[in-house]
């Protein structure tokens, strides 16, 4: 069962000026599409072909002989998740149960923000920053390259892509500025709250 490249949940210009139309076109239509195509080609005709992409990621994680499948599956999933983590006019602070949980587990929203900024800024090279639910507790973590916290039994709630292709056209080497805009102007807290409620 082929995994389909999802449409962006907003127009290519919707996240400007934080993320440009050019970045979204390259990132979604080229990078994300390539991961999806490579994944589908890699599993076609195998026993993984009829499994969900999440099950494939968990099944092949850590298997060096299936690194190509894992990398493309995880990157396809990570990007699909990432698009939904942003929205036009996003950012600010969450409310309701999510806000209460962040305050309980981090001490304050500001403490969460600092932890998330640190995770994104200190991820050496390519990777992702995440807010996850780990045995009932919210935690910030980071993963290199295509890695996904679901392989460690954690539930992803929010992610930020810190591969250079996510921000370089707009921010060049200023990753901290991209991170600040992501948190302050782009995060889709409704999506994060729904992920927490479903966990």
From Swiss-Prot:
Metal-binding is among the record's keywords: yes
Gene3D superfamilies on file: Fe,Mn superoxide dismutase (SOD) domain, Iron/manganese superoxide dismutase, C-terminal domain
Entry's EC annotation: 1.15.1.1
SUPFAM superfamilies the record matches: Fe,Mn superoxide dismutase (SOD), C-terminal domain, Fe,Mn superoxide dismutase (SOD), N-terminal domain
InterPro entries with a match to the protein in the record: Mn/Fe_SOD, Mn/Fe_SOD_BS, Mn/Fe_SOD_C, Mn/Fe_SOD_N, Mn/Fe_SOD_N_sf, SOD_C_sf
PANTHER family documented for this protein: SUPEROXIDE DISMUTASE (PTHR42769), SUPEROXIDE DISMUTASE [FE] 2, CHLOROPLASTIC (PTHR42769:SF3)
Function: Destroys superoxide anion radicals which are normally produced within the cells and which are toxic to biological systems.
Annotated family: Belongs to the iron/manganese superoxide dismutase family.
Protein name: Superoxide dismutase [Fe]
Gene name, Swiss-Prot/TrEMBL: sodB
